[in-house]
Structure formats: structure tokens, C-alpha cells
């Protein structure tokens, strides 16, 4: 549970060389392939676009997000668009790889570039969002969320750029 995490995290170094940097990458060792079989395939960009264009009886958080396409039967979310960057997939992957026990982040199954659009394939995390639950949260709930977010921020602050290999704030 996040609430009982230690707050004295050891600094973790992150280098661009440790990040997967291909335009098209699939993490065959991810839970998607463990759960669906080694020969399972992620939806192609054409399939994602087709699903995004299909009229849906979807309400809530998915109703107004054409750039986030859920594939509920596969427990898969594909985020895509021309303003999306592979760096977002790299960041999610790096945070889960280095801080996964302390920072809740969806598992990334892969990403690809198709023309000027990037597609990031990730775990579909189901449940209520804070936005949806806001009106029903008690002061105790708010305090717990505050503590959890505090520990998450401390964990994120433990990430450091490798000396001589800085990439954040470089441009």
C-alpha cells in the first residue's frame, strides 16, 4: 500500500541509454503477452483508428477522448495522435521499471509510429477516477489521497539523471 511506503528513497540514476528508443517496439515480456499468449498481437494503427471512429455507447471518461481508445476485452488502452511523443511511452516505461512499487503507472506494452502519429499501447486501468469520485470523497479520503500523492512525489524526486548524461532541460 502506498500509504506505508518509506520516505527515504535512495537516489536512482536514469540515463537515456537505458531507455528503449526505437520508433516501433513491443515488450514481449509484458503481462499482455503472458496473459494473451506469446503469439498475441497488439492492434495495428489501422485497427485503432477504426475503433476510434466507431460510434460507441461509452460514457464517463472514455466518451470524450478520441485519442484514448480502450479495448476492454484485451484490458488494453491505446493512446495515439500526432501530438503524442514516444518520450511519453519511454517515461511511463522508465517510471514503472524503476519505481513501479512506489508510483502507480500503467504497464506499457509497446509503441509505434505510423506516419506522423504515435501509438502507445498500455494497460487499461479500470475503476473510478478522482474526477468522477470527487463529490463523494470525505475529508479522510482527501487526507489519504494527499499522503499517497506525497509519497509518489518523493519517489519521483529520487530519480536522478546520470552525471554527464543529462537529457532533461537540455534543449
Question: Where on the chain are the PLM-derived regions?
Answer:
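Juxta-kinase regulatory segment immediately upstream of eukaryotic protein kinase catalytic domains
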Residues: 1-58
Amino acid at each position: 500500500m502506498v500509504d506505508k511506503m518509506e520516505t527515504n528513497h535512495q537516489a536512482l540514476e536514469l540515463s537515456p541509454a537505458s531507455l528503449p528508443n526505437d520508433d516501433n517496439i513491443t515488450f514481449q515480456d509484458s503481462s499482455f503477452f503472458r496473459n494473451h499468449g506469446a503469439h498475441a498481437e497488439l492492434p495495428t494503427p489501422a485497427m485503432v483508428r477504426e475503433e476510434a471512429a466507431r460510434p460507441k455507447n461509452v460514457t464517463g471518461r472514455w466518451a470524450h477522448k478520441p485519442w484514448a481508445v480502450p479495448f476492454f476485452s484485451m484490458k488494453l488502452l491505446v493512446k495515439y495522435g500526432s501530438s503524442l511523443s514516444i518520450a511519453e511511452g519511454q517515461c511511463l516505461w522508465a517510471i514503472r521499471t524503476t519505481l513501479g512499487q512506489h508510483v502507480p503507472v500503467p504497464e506499457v506494452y509497446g509503441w509505434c509510429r505510423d506516419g506522423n502519429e504515435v501509438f502507445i499501447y498500455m494497460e487499461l486501468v479500470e475503476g473510478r477516477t478522482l474526477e468522477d469520485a470527487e463529490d463523494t470523497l470525505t475529508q479522510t479520503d482527501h487526507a489519504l489521497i494527499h499522503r499517497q500523492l506525497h509519497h509518489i512525489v518523493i519517489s519521483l524526486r529520487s530519480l536522478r539523471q546520470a552525471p554527464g548524461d543529462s537529457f532533461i532541460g537540455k534543449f
